[in-house]
């Protein structure tokens, strides 16, 4: 549509100058005229706007375009059924969110090698993988999320999935897109309503009245509640194979499948990706949550009361550092990193683990709700926590593109082919059954509000309270 529209606009005629202006004296006089300068500026702006096609989802200063951005390209796959579903959903999404950008992942499908690798996840004896998220304001992320869900439904089949989404509040098109595009798409792809719970339009939170960790834990528990509550008359707890909890990041189906594959293969309690705030230079995002298995230290120890670049990860954990450099899964004490696969068993009787804030009255350090989940998994006997560094995620579009490029090059150098690692980099994790003797903690201040500086205080504490 854009190309046809573009041809209907006449190219602006170049204004002719008076004949006398060709003389050096006339040109000098004219160049000093305010009207001439203004005209020149306007012509430059016009041509810059003519050439510019800003990306609405990119969070950076961009030159405004004269015309709308080009329509997204049609997705082509070998699977025609998948191709139709992807393109039909994309078209429906564009009608709801016309200003949204394209997906970051231009090819949402799996490679043939990946399809072969993940076959064990779709065997008939397998249960369902419960996809869970708390989300808001994700217009930019929705194209990739929609594609991811469609590919997972097509590859795993609807009988192997369940979905729980808690949204809001959003001021962009997120709520409308979830209600009018995502939910109908799940129905069209065969996921029964008994295996979906989608709640939108959550009220705005007055953070001045809430402890951040306590409130976020409450929201996570609400999103996860169908695991133990079910939906309608349908019980979920007996059929959920694994919980896949994700944040507002740019996803690809292979990200989720690789994490679930490693989780099942290694018999883990929690398996996570890596997430980044920035990639150039590197700022590891979930630094407040992650702890190493050997020393209990941060993945990137911060010695100053502020966040600093983290290109030198795991300086105090040689085994973790070596595995990370080779993109091999490795054990940690705790991690979340935007995408976490969790065993459902600790959330169910007799353990009944929940996201929570620290019990300060008992002397427990006020850690993140995600650190405390790992702590409670350890305590319940599910302390096999792993990071899969080949899956790296970003919250910002530009960072996601940097990751795709940088990790893609690293995988190529390491011998990955079609998204699958070489055999010598695909061993099982050798688990330690013991946690670190002490774990580093930066307590959240006992004040209400959304933000605080946790780096001002450092404690070394027992892995968990008895």
UniProtKB/Swiss-Prot annotation:
The entry's free-text remark on the cofactor is: Divalent metal cations. Mg(2+), Mn(2+) or Co(2+) can be used.
Which compartment or compartments is the protein found in?
Golgi apparatus membrane
Q: Which domain of life is it from?
A: Eukaryota
Q: Which residues lie on this side of the membrane: Lumenal?
A: 55-466
**Pathway recorded for this protein:** Protein modification; protein glycosylation
- Its Enzyme Commission number(s) read 2.4.1.-
* Ranges of the Cytoplasmic topological domain: 1-33
| Keyword Transferase carried by entry | yes
Q: Where are the transmembrane segments?
A: 34-54
| Cellular component, GO, one term | Golgi membrane
Q: Does the keyword Transferase apply?
A: yes
Q: Which cofactor does it need?
A: Mg(2+); Mn(2+); Co(2+)
MF annotations from Gene Ontology: glycosyltransferase activity
Q: What function does this protein fulfil?
A: Responsible for addition of mannose residues in an alpha-1,3 linkage to a polymannosly precursor. May be involved in synthesis of capsule glucuronoxylomannan.
Under what name is this protein listed? Alpha-1,3-mannosyltransferase CMT1
Primary gene name:
CMT1
